[in-house]
């Protein structure tokens, strides 16, 4: 029994001594660095220097660690310490000096407009030190100054593949992908959806975390009627940035277009949870509740919307629709009136305002509202129809017949207009 205990003690003690060997810790750190596990390598190198502060290879290890992070100054400091302890490492120090010289040469060549020569200098660094992200960064910067933003994006992204924490490369890539996004947005506004898509796709090709480009791809696909693809892109944007309320909202609109109203409600509520002041989400949510005839819920969310923003014209408009559906035309007219005050160019608001006024027999105001609708959108039968109703209500049969001719031109309003004109011409037919 004593022999067994002694053997176990020897093994444990031997293992402890083995783990305390700075050479072993240094080798473990090198293995970690090659795998990109730089924080673990840092801990192992620190441990080796605790055991033996004069262990020069650990300082070389730190020098390489800093080089992998793109910090040539700190890499040189650690290399200098190693050389002071052991001249054997002078060649490594010289290699760092060569990097510094080539970077200076590259910068000078860029200033002189010799971009190809600068790229050769940086490529020479990459060939010798492929894990040094700063070289890829300078290649990206050279391409950026040469106005080749796609090549710049490639090199910035390569630097980040080597070391994701490289802040200058991250900033450079952000600048480039934002340019691609802006170019895409300009193409989108011009109506060139194919070109816009190309720019957005390039942005996410170089930066798979660029949620705004995924969002814009979703908007584009939605506009083209590709609902499934749009939803996929919106979900990608949300996966990257879960608190992006606009993506939740626009995802909701995609589900609403597909008549998947339950899913749309969930997405709108999520948008509201993330941004309680986002009135558009309340407006769309109220619209769905109106469609499914849950009027109390519709009123609640729409009243909340106009409390948040009393000038939210669409909120007043939709609240007016809720009241109209319940045949509360006076209340509806008050909301439609506010909608026209806050959005004077909305023909639909003027049309609905005229309709509600006709329903409560305020024919003079209804005629004026209908005329506003007609002035804004002449080729809309609804405005002409409400004008017919208003003029007839005022007792102006001649004008009503005149406006009937206009209303009768529009297929969607023809049946109603013809019934109304028959009522004008044959009043006894409609007497109760």
Enumerate the predicted regions with their spans.
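Helix-start (N-cap) detector for alpha-helical repeat units in TPR-like alpha-solenoids
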Residues: 22-23, 56-57, 90, 99, ...
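Structural marker of alpha-solenoid helical repeat scaffolds
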Residues: 51, 85, 128, 162, ...
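Alpha-helical adaptor scaffolds
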Residues: 98, 107, 321, 325, ...
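Terminal, low-structured helical/coil segments at or just beyond the last alpha-helical repeat
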Residues: 105-108, 170, 175, 179-191, ...
């Amino acid at each position: 029994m004593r022999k067994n205990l002694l053997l176990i003690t020897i093994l444990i003690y031997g293992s402890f001594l083995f783990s305390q060997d700075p050479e072993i810790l240094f080798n473990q750190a090198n293995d970690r660095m090659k795998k990109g596990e730089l924080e673990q390598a840092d801990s192992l190198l620190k441990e080796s220097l605790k055991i033996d502060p004069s262990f020069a290879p650990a300082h070389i290890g730190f020098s390489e660690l800093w080089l992998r992070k793109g910090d040539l100054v700190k890499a040189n400091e650690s290399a200098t310490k190693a050389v002071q302890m052991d001249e054997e490492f002078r060649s490594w120090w010289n290699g760092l000096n060569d990097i510094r010289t080539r970077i200076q040469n590259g910068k000078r060549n860029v200033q002189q407009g010799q971009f190809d020569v600068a790229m050769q200098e940086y490529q020479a660094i990459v060939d010798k030190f492929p894990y040094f992200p700063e070289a890829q960064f300078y290649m990206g910067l050279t391409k950026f100054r040469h106005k080749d933003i796609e090549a710049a994006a490639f090199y910035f992204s390569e630097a980040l593949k080597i070391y994701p924490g490289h802040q200058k490369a991250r900033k450079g890539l952000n600048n480039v992908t934002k340019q691609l996004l802006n170019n895409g947005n300009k193409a989108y506004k011009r109506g060139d959806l194919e070109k816009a898509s190309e720019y957005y796709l390039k942005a996410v090709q170089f930066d798979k975390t660029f949620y705004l480009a995924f969002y814009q791809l979703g908007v584009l696909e939605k506009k083209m009627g590709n609902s499934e693809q749009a939803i996929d892109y919106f979900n990608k944007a949300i996966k990257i940035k879960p608190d992006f309320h606009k993506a939740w909202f626009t995802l909701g609109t995609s589900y609403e277009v597909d008549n998947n109203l339950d899913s749309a409600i969930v997405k709108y509520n999520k948008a509201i949870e993330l941004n309680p002041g986002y009135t558009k989400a309340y407006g769309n949510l109220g619209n769905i509740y109106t469609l499914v005839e849950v009027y109390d819920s519709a009123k609640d969310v729409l009243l909340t919307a106009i409390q948040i923003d009393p000038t939210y014209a669409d909120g007043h408009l939709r609240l007016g629709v809720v009241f109209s559906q319940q045949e509360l035309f006076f209340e509806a007219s008050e909301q439609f009136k506010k909608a026209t005050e806050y959005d004077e160019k909305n023909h639909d608001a003027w049309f609905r305002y005229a309709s509600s006024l006709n329903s409560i027999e305020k024919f003079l105001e209804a005629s004026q509202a209908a005329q506003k609708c007609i002035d804004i959108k002449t080729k809309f039968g609804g405005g002409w129809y409400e004008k017919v109703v208003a003029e007839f209500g005022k007792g102006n049969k001649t004008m009503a017949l005149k406006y009937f001719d206009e209303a009768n031109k529009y297929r969607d309003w023809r049946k109603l207009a013809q019934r109304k004109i028959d009522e004008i011409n044959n009043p006894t037919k409609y007497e109760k």
